[in-house]
A protein has these predicted regions:
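A short linear-motif detector with a strong N-terminal bias
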Residues: 6-11, 54-56, 68-72
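Short, polar/flexible loop-turn hinges at active-site or ligand-entry regions and domain interfaces
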Residues: 54-57, 98-102, 121-131
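Short, surface-exposed recognition loops or helix-turn segments adjacent to catalytic cores
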Residues: 127-139, 154
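Active-site SXXK
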Residues: 44-53
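M16 family metallopeptidases and their MPP-like homologs
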Residues: 18, 24-43, 61-117, 121, ...
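N-terminal start-of-chain detector that recognizes signal peptides
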Residues: 1-5, 51, 60-66
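N- or domain-start disorder-to-order transition segments that initiate the globular core
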Residues: 1-26
Length: 154
């Protein structure tokens, strides 16, 4: 394995990569670390979910999923975790390694660009706010997820 490579993409934002040719998939993650507070914890969880669903270029879930399908079935996930006194929000894209694509498609570049657009070109209105109907949907989905976890018998 090569040494880590670091690329600065914006002020305070760096990409650290560890190239390896032994895997059939690529994993690309973006993490945000924020102070944990009762006031912002649920908002941050909603924000991560909203970012992982659509972008300006792919404003509906259907269009977003179609783009993922075009990337040989790539997937995007988000997670929110407590890390000490901080909250860690992570967006992850998983895609087929370019070596396994037809006609030398650059799947990893497209997956990376999609991940970047989720953060830097989010599906927000002219005031930089998420659309109310999207917020309501994510609140409902998050509440359903929490309820199902509470009701799960282990």
């Amino acid at each position: 394995m090569k040494d880590f490579e670091t690329i600065c993409v914006a002020s305070g934002v760096q990409i650290v990569s560890a190239p390896a040719n032994r895997f059939k998939t690529n994993e690309i993650s973006i993490s945000f670390c924020t102070p944990l507070s009762a006031k912002t914890a649920s908002r941050n969880a909603l924000c991560a979910n909203l970012l992982a669903r659509t972008t300006k270029k792919y404003p509906t879930l259907s269009e977003f999923n179609k783009k993922l399908a075009m990337l040989y079935g790539a997937s995007v996930t988000c997670s929110v975790a407590k890390l000490g006194e901080n909250q860690l929000l992570t967006l992850n894209a998983s895609s087929l390694d370019d070596r396994f694509s037809f006609e030398n498609d650059k799947i990893s570049v497209d997956a990376f660009n999609l991940l970047m657009s989720m953060v830097f070109d989010a599906n927000v209105d002219e005031n930089g706010l998420f659309y109310p109907q999207d917020i309501d949907r994510e609140k409902r989905l998050l509440a359903e997820k929490i309820e199902s976890e509470e009701n799960e018998k282990r």
